[in-house]
């Protein structure tokens, strides 16, 4: 049975287009027997903003403050959750040409040297291997494969850096360019989801 971690990151909650699409995916995959864990990074599961004290504490050490230890424990739990699942589904609405702050914050909590990646004499090596990722990205305009799409290249780079190179991307484009364009973008995204196996 496939285990799936879904990361929601829209600040619009249930009103967001990315939430609509990921709920569509969840409904299909649950019917196929997948066990799905949802983490709402912009809702009930919002993470603290990583600051200097937290970043220093995530490196570990013998003398951590109480807050640093709490944040290190949280990071360890997030990494364990990531590693425990077979597929990671990331919803990423485009905000000002990039990913939501809440999603970037999750990345900062799980991207840890010696834990999710390591440095070797041949360069960095990801330690979260044998996983698959699905990116569901929603945009008001049309950005796919263009110079204004900084999201998908960034997310693929991050995932590859920690060892996840099997990545599918679902695009929902031009959602704010009129009712017809919105309907077309959502329909095409759902068609892409229909082609994905658990």
UniProtKB/Swiss-Prot annotation:
* Co-factor(s): FMN
- This protein's name: FMN-dependent NADH:quinone oxidoreductase
Which family does the UniProt entry place this protein in? Belongs to the azoreductase type 1 family.
**Name of encoding gene:** azoR
Cofactor binding annotation: Binds 1 FMN per subunit.
What taxonomic lineage is listed for the species of origin? Answer: Bacteria, Pseudomonadati, Pseudomonadota, Gammaproteobacteria, Alteromonadales
Assembly with partners or alone: Homodimer.
Q: Which GO terms describe its molecular function?
A: electron transfer activity; FMN binding; oxidoreductase activity, acting on NAD(P)H as acceptor; oxidoreductase activity, acting on NAD(P)H, quinone or similar compound as acceptor
State the organism of origin.
Shewanella oneidensis (strain ATCC 700550 / JCM 31522 / CIP 106686 / LMG 19005 / NCIMB 14063 / MR-1)
Q: Which UniProt keywords apply?
A: Flavoprotein, FMN, NAD, Oxidoreductase
Provide the function of this protein.
Quinone reductase that provides resistance to thiol-specific stress caused by electrophilic quinones.
EC no.? 1.6.5.-, 1.7.1.17
Q: Which Gene3D superfamilies match?
A: 3.40.50.360
